[in-house]
Amino acid sequence: MSRFWHFKKFYFSSCFSKQRMSRRIIKNELLVPMKVTSKHEQEQPITNDEPRSLLSEDANPSPDVESEPELESEQSENREDVHEIIRSMVLGTGTTLPRLSNDSLTGIYNYWKLNPNDDLPLYNPTKYTPFEFHSQYNQDRSYISTPRLSVTKLLVFSWCELRSFYQVYSGSVRLPSTQAMTQGTKLHSKLEAEIHPEIDTTEIEQFLLSNAMSLGELQKAVPIEEDKVVFYLGEVERLAVDWAEMLIERLFSLIMGAEAREILLHGYLNFNNRSFVTNKDEIRDPSSVLVSGIVDYVKLQNLTNPSDGTLFDDIHGFVDDNFDQVDNVPLVDLSKFLPEAKQILQHYDFRLTFTDVKTRSAPQIPRQESVLEAAKFQTFYYRHFFQLLSRDSRFTYFSLIENAERRGHDVDKPLSILTTICLLRKHYHILFKDFVRLANGEPIGFAPFDDSAKSMAYDFVSVFQSSDEFSLANPNHTHFFEQLREIDGIEYDSILSPLLKVWKTPPTLRYLAARASQLFGVFEENLGDVTSVEYRLNKTSQLLSENVYEYDFSEFQVEVESASKFWNGEREAVPTEDLSRCSFCEFQSKCMVAGGNTTEAVEKKTIGPKIRHFLNECESSSKG
């Protein structure tokens, strides 16, 4: 019988009779009275002011405890083993705590209340699952305010599951950015700009703010309580900009130009059944965890003839024949375009392919099989998310609404005037017609939005005047348009004049969710099973290699189940068998596996954490 089970049997026979031990050692904080320091902090000795060692009478059952005769002999024999275990869990008086080598180690030793002289255990001594801990103790506060996971977080096996496990319980300490990471980010931005050139609205924003502040009658034009509607740029506005750019604009580009980069995707992973939610009624289930990701590159093409462009000829022909232009740019009416585009796509055997781009600082691809497998499954996640979001526009609409609301956003809050004008400038070719509808209080043709959109006055006229011609009674915008045109040459009078009024329906996150969900729905019949991973040299963007895969749902579901069990605490982390990887790990100096310990030694060192876990369960049971 192992030492742990000796302890467990002994503990049950005494703890639940008088519960003397539970009053003293049931609390984790009494087991190890210390705070561990990193190398950046001062060493702190344990003094006599700390809680007493548990090696006195507190660790023994009361002498008046009556136990069954058959247990007395075994209790006596095992008591010394138990005392030794407890003694190993508590620092002696006057002990000096050593410094740990990095913040990640400091974090996990403090959160787990470990003796810094000991190695890290392989067993979670807390009552929190990895996801629960990740959502409560995280250096990135956004994960606490909005509990969620990313696709890359699900790929815990990529390097070493034990490292991923320790990273979670260290408080998800952010590792410093390396030069290779910085170069990789620059390459991603470069590739993105090649397809989606950035439109910088900084000068326009500065002009609008300066002009508004110079209006002598600003407070009459915009009451004080509405100032935030004009100028405020908060989290709602930032999400609106992201949805307009990385959903609506990117999906429209995919329809019109066959390719798009950096598209936002998400799904809801139900930990109970270990699969992604497919029914809108399950989205709000507490066990459904938001999982987000960004797919690097999506292409719509004829797989048997990649040079075939007839589909896009038809779509461009429809746009040119049916919509007016401003500055040689068609003003697309999405209410007419979306159903027609979907019908055109259904007549062609074009399929979507999904690619993730990995940057390399050296001209070679990874040699580790687990790293290559993780990259493959990353593309599988993106492909699966796209399927979930394109199969039913209503589901996608409510999925996006839930996404925003989980982040604490009011989806019916009007966007600021400044945000609206910037969205119009960047995306007037697809938003202008919709904005006219909103201004007039007309439906956009998508029932879930039209049935729930809230009508309210939205003043989109007062601040669009120059101070030298300002008038509340008879607004004059001539000079204002001239000043705007000097900034970037756009024909603002054509795209602004019809909107300069008090709108009946304001632009909101709800509106953007509606159009994004419809754009996803255009691709319902054109989803493909080909995914790939590109490896590029980050300094030159040279393509080093491309690994192509065939999406396999059964294989993907096995990975989803494994990730779910890890994050829900249903299985233990599996350490890497390749110890050469340990030299890159921040936990190496305290990891049993990296130290090459035998199985017997590892098992022995997990006794303490198992006891902590057991005591937590005892505490929960006694409270219940």
Swiss-Prot record:
Reported cofactor(s): Mg(2+); [4Fe-4S] cluster
GO term, biological process aspect, one: interstrand cross-link repair
Residue span of region Disordered: 37-80
EC numbers on record: 3.1.-.-
Transit peptide: 1-61
Binding note for cofactor: Binds 1 [4Fe-4S] cluster.
Compartments, as annotated in UniProt: Mitochondrion
Principal subcellular localisation of the protein: mitochondrion
Binding site for [4Fe-4S] cluster: C160, C582, C585, C591
Pfam families per the UniProt record, alphabetical: Exo5 (PF09810)
Family matches, as InterPro entries: EXOV
Ranges annotated as biased composition (Acidic residues): 65-75
Entry GO terms, CC: mitochondrion; nucleus
PANTHER family, alphabetized: EXONUCLEASE V
Purpose: Single strand DNA specific 5'exonuclease involved in mitochondrial DNA replication and recombination. Releases dinucleotides as main products of catalysis. Has the capacity to slide across 5'double-stranded DNA or 5'RNA sequences and resumes cutting two nucleotides downstream of the double-stranded-to-single-stranded junction or RNA-to-DNA junction, respectively.
Identification of the protein by name: Exonuclease V, mitochondrial
Organism: Candida dubliniensis (strain CD36 / ATCC MYA-646 / CBS 7987 / NCPF 3949 / NRRL Y-17841) (Yeast)
